[in-house]
């Protein structure tokens, strides 16, 4: 019989992340297990959550040279572009709602020529009990809040090491390109673009 883990505040999660040794941010299992064993209470996230009907929002909670932690807010039906993580490790947890991660295998990429070929590989559902890690060997994916889930969702993302660009892909068009990443809020305060 498993015992339900009592949710902690986002501040307690940050303190726990800051105590993890640098080596923990290499293999994907250690941080994923930490997120599973340390669910975050929805109430403590309130200062970091912003919503936009047009696009999901990226809200920076904590950043060190080793990692960055953000909350991404998803309205019903919103999805990210298919993207990679620049050879960085990424772990995701969903303290509010549930989401799908659609993974892709990158068959070919010519970034200079802006061409690529992807094949869908698998889909994983994330919820409060099921955080996941992006496979560094096959890191191309998108996150989706399907209409049939019929609820807002919030995902917490831990990236090691922080990065400011990524490659986005259009599987349908066979194209790819680099984009600059930005935050809607940093440490609970709006960011001007």
Stretch-by-stretch model annotation:
Residues 47, 51-76:
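A short glycine-rich, His/Asp/Glu-containing loop-to-beta-strand
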Residues 91-92, 149-165:
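A short hydrophobic beta-strand segment most commonly corresponding to one strand
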Residues 172-193:
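Long hydrophobic alpha-helical segments typical of transmembrane helices together
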Residues 1-40:
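N-terminal leader/capping segments at the start of a protein or of a new domain
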Residues 91, 106-140, 181-184:
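Short acidic-glycine-tyrosine-enriched beta hairpin
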Residues 76, 87-107:
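Glycine- and acidic-residue-biased ligand/ion/polar-headgroup-sensing regions
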Residues 143-147:
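Asparagine-centered strand-capping/turn motif at beta-strand->loop junctions
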Residues 71-85, 136-138:
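Conserved short histidine dyad/triad with adjacent acidic residue
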